[in-house]
């Protein structure tokens, strides 16, 4: 009998995110908000909405609603791209900086706690295995297109 690896990985991501989400409750950010802010911060500046949606792994229409909410909170701005007027570039505002620092601190601290007892070499090996699984899955998608 094969182990349900896909389900195990999905559950791991779900419970890890839920733990971070619980710890970020004092910031009054939804999971969608902090995941989006975290990705904007760690991607090169001025990403387009399309690039950000791909990085997060969601559809662009879903992202637009989240970006609207973050813009209303004064945490991001969107600017029309000079090269493609249909595209919008996303920038963090100054008021987002302390929130980003708090989010990153919680994520980093939680990661350290979750990985307690696992050697850096084991973490590196796991990262390589996950990257290989992703590469295989993407290749399968391309072959079916």
UniProtKB/Swiss-Prot annotation:
This is Transcriptional regulator SlyA. It comes from Pectobacterium atrosepticum (strain SCRI 1043 / ATCC BAA-672) (Erwinia carotovora subsp. atroseptica). The keyword Transcription applies. GO terms for molecular function: DNA binding; DNA-binding transcription factor activity. Belongs to the SlyA family. Residues 2-135 form the HTH marR-type domain. Residues 49-72 bind DNA. SUPFAM superfamilies: Winged helix' DNA-binding domain. Keywords: Activator, DNA-binding, Repressor, Transcription, Transcription regulation. GO terms for biological process: response to stress. InterPro entries: HTH_MarR-typ, MarR/SlyA-like, Tscrpt_reg_MarR-type_CS, Tscrpt_reg_SlyA, WH-like_DNA-bd_sf, WH_DNA-bd_sf. Pfam families: MarR. Homodimer. Transcription regulator that can specifically activate or repress expression of target genes.
């Amino acid at each position: 009998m094969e182990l349900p690896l896909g389900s195990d990985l999905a559950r791991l991501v779900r419970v890890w995110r839920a733990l971070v989400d619980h710890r970020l409750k004092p910031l009054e950010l939804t999971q969608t908000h902090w995941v989006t802010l975290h990705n904007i911060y760690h991607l090169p500046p001025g990403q387009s909405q399309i690039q950000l949606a791909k990085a997060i792994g969601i559809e662009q229409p879903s992202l637009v609603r989240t970006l609207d909410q973050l813009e209303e909170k004064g945490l991001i701005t969107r600017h029309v791209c000079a090269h493609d007027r249909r595209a919008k570039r996303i920038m963090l505002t100054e008021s987002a900086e302390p929130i980003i620092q708090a989010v990153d601190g919680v994520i980093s601290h939680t990661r350290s706690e979750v990985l307690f007892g696992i050697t850096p070499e084991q973490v590196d090996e796991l990262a390589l295995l996950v990257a290989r699984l992703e590469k295989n899955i993407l290749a399968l998608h391309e072959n079916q297109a």
